[in-house]
Amino acid sequence: MNSRKLFSKLKEESYDVSIFDLMNAKVYLEKDMTYLPEDYKKGYLEDFFTFFPEVLREIKNKTEEEIEDFEIDEEEIKKVDLRLCSMGSKKMGRNSYEKLVKTVINYLIFINKRPLHALTTRFPGGKQIIEKNGNYYCPIKNAQSNELSICEFCICKDLNEL
């Protein structure tokens, strides 16, 4: 698939994500994170619901002409979408969460080539993604052995490579 074609599709999808979807997605994620430590959960939710709406705005404000023209393996897009659909529980708000995440994550992976988490996100142990000389380094990149993880698609390198 052509990058501009994918971007055009994602831009169209970005307009389908409403304020109600954002609210439902937040309720969904809060419930899905019930058993995580409160301070970690609070920080993650703040970062997520600052970062993802910012990326949605970015998608809406860009034009197709601003997107570099290149080919993207459609099988990779399908793999990402399948993983995103498999993550988390099937609680109320799931559809809103999926709509938001599929649009933003596909944009970050295939079009914008940026980390999938905000640079301010604190991971267990208090570590964050580090940007150095145009490269991103993640403290959990190689720690994710879950077959449903989408880390393998993220542009970040492992923090140990720094």
UniProtKB/Swiss-Prot annotation:
Pfam families: DUF2115. It comes from the Archaea. InterPro entries: DUF2115. HAMAP family: UPF0305. Belongs to the UPF0305 family. NCBIfam families: PRK01022.1-1. This is UPF0305 protein MmarC7_1691. It comes from Methanococcus maripaludis (strain C7 / ATCC BAA-1331).
